[in-house]
Amino acid sequence: SFTVEGLTDRQIVKYQKDFWSTLNDRNKVSKNILLNHHVRPVTVGEKRILRIDVPAADRHDKPVYIGTDPMKGTYKRDYEGDFLCTEEAVRAMFADQRDVSGDVEVLDEFGLDVLNQDTIKGYRIIFEQLHSGHPWNALENDEFLMKLRAAAKNKKGTLSPTIAGLLFFGEAYRITEVFPNYFLDYREECNDKAVRWLFRTHSNEGDWSGNIYDFFCKVRTRIDDDVAVPFANRRDGYRVDRVDVHDALEEALANALAHANYYGRRGILVVKKGKELSISNPGTIRVTKEEFYAGGNSDPRNPNILKMFGFVNVGERAGSGVDKIMTAWAEQNWKKPEFDFSERSDRVTLKLEV
């Protein structure tokens, strides 16, 4: 337990002066993100103390570090205290500073032959069904991919995939040339410890493309078939076999794929065990938790990937996905979805009752 000893007025003035002096010394702290109201004297019982509130740093300011070396002076705080960030986590913070979408970067060293033609064909079929009469439907594949910003002209004037295009339509073995830790994994597990899993598919199997769009389609089918929700009825009396729960699940999966840091370790992991589904992606959220739950400002790490999902009616560009998930689960009277924001492992995990 702690005992409040209190400070004198003179001590408060001195500590405030010393604190601000240190905080504004660039040899000691990389950036001062505090304002005057964050440091103020307060009364606890009959004792005076100095209260310091440290706000969450905006992604444009991260990393905020001690000393002059970000690799040795960047710390994060979790429920157990402060811990030194890995160099990988620090590099991810620098990458997240950019406002320009990183997933539209052109991969000059690749041609469009690294993309899977069957994936593109399947995507275009869905696109045409949803957007009949759209002018893009008449385009050749190369032009269509350019409209999606899945491809662009490289320095030589020929076409190359963008990062979004490679991840969305590419072959897994070519994706790992850019993202060595890239791995997409879906498992169906049971409580029998003698059985590792009931079903599994992952991006390194070799008998399918391994890209994020085909992974999404494969996993969506498995999840849709197992979700026990009642049929919904339209006003005309006909029933429909898809309700908000299915849409919310699709959005949760698409959001994980669009918000993932593909340079991070361990990749995407989706696990279904009994009535629980967990969806985990590398990369922490780029907004505050309050903004995350409020919706309207999702700030995706890979916005063009989210846009390509949006063209086939998956995902919410406006950032209302969390609200949709919460509402859908509440309507079914299911357990409230849980988000785990792991600072140590730089991952976000969503746990759902299905």
For every predicted segment, state its role.
Residues 1-245, 254-354:
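Conserved N-terminal catalytic/coupling substructures associated with nucleotide/phosphate chemistry
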Residues 248:
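Conserved N-box helix within the HATPase_c
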Residues 251:
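Active-site alpha-helix of zinc metalloproteases
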